[in-house]
Amino acid sequence: MRIHYLLFAVLFLFLMPVPGEGGIINTIQRYFCRVRGGRCAALTCLPRETQIGRCSVKGRKCCRTRK
């Protein structure tokens, strides 16, 4: 029965995100950006766009054209 605790701890360590890289979080944020009709911009939004959110932990912006 103790082996289950060890396996759980090892599995937990492998699933923890590396600091600075939120793999699962970034994927979810990109998905919701696209659902809201936006796109992920690396640095800034284009002049005819407005920022509606973020696409990653590192600062990519979710931009959508102004209505």
UniProtKB/Swiss-Prot annotation:
Keywords: Antibiotic, Antimicrobial, Defensin, Disulfide bond, Fungicide, Membrane, Secreted, Signal. One of its GO terms (molecular function) is chemoattractant activity. The keyword Secreted applies. It comes from Chinchilla lanigera (Long-tailed chinchilla). GO terms for biological process: calcium-mediated signaling; cell chemotaxis; defense response to fungus; defense response to Gram-negative bacterium; defense response to Gram-positive bacterium; killing by host of symbiont cells; positive regulation of flagellated sperm motility involved in capacitation. Residues 1-22 form the signal peptide. This is Beta-defensin 1. Belongs to the beta-defensin family. The keyword Secreted applies. Disulfide bonds join C33-C62, C40-C55, C45-C63. Has antibacterial activity against Gram-positive bacterium S.pneumoniae Serotype 14. Is also active against Gram-negative bacteria M.catarrhalis 1857, and non-typeable H.influenzae strains 86-028NP and 1128. Has antifungal activity against C.albicans. May have a role in maintaining sterility in the middle ear. May act as a ligand for C-C chemokine receptor CCR6. Positively regulates the sperm motility and bactericidal activity in a CCR6-dependent manner. Binds to CCR6 and triggers Ca2+ mobilization in the sperm which is important for its motility. Highly expressed in tongue, nasopharyngeal mucosa and skin, and to a lower extent in the Eustachian tube, lung and trachea. PANTHER family: BETA-DEFENSIN, BETA-DEFENSIN 103. Pfam families: Defensin_beta (PF00711). Transmembrane segments: none annotated. GO terms for cellular component: extracellular space; membrane; microvesicle; sperm midpiece. Monomer. Homodimer. It is found in: Secreted; Membrane.
